């Protein structure tokens, strides 16, 4: 499922990335303005963004259903524990992909989601401040928050997820498909 969606997703990101502005000099206002431009003035912009939005929902559902299938058939057992852990990491990064993309329009919903996310990060014992700074460019919401999410969503997460998918598929290829237990 992930691989068949990959090239179309790359194309959609390139088109959306040409017109999206995460903000400049700590001001997130251009993010909302550029999203408004994509949705209202760019030819087929509404369709491209909607396809990107809905395929994201499909991706999260597909990964979740795949994890359920692996769990209920017992395919995570010996000798496939490492592949299960990679799959759990892929599920986490898929959800974080959706979350980081959810913040990019920087409307009132995105601001609320960022507030919840930064409060959750700050409440993590011992490493909360570091986690908040790494994810949101500070321990409070600032103009750099949307820029950080854009950077994670467009540059870091695709590399991490693609690497994990390749490792996941390589292990499946090396060990073979698990028989249900």
Question: Locations of the language-model features?
Answer:
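Membrane-interfacial helix termini and the short, flexible loops that connect transmembrane helices
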Residues: 18-31, 64-82, 102-111, 137, ...
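Long, contiguous internal "core" modules enriched in hydrophobic/ aromatic residues
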Residues: 147-148, 152-181
């Amino acid at each position: 499922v992930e691989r068949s969606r990959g090239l179309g997703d790359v194309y959609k990101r390139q088109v959306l990335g040409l017109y999206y502005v995460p903000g400049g000099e700590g001001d997130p206002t251009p993010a909302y303005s550029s999203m408004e431009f994509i949705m209202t003035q760019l030819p087929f912009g509404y369709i491209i963004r909607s396809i990107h939005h809905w395929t994201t929902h499909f991706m999260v559902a597909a990964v979740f259903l795949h994890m359920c299938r692996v769990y209920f058939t017992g395919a995570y057992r010996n000798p496939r524990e490492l592949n299960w852990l990679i799959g759990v990491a892929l599920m986490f990064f898929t959800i974080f992909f959706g979350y980081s993309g959810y913040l990019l329009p920087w409307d009132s919903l995105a601001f609320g989601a960022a507030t919840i996310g930064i409060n959750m990060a700050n409440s993590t014992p011992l490493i909360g401040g570091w986690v908040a700074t790494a994810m949101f460019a500070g321990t409070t919401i600032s103009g750099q928050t949307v820029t950080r999410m854009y950077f994670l969503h467009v540059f870091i997460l695709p590399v991490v997820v693609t690497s994990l998918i390749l490792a996941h598929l390589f292990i499946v290829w090396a060990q073979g498909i698990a028989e249900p237990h």
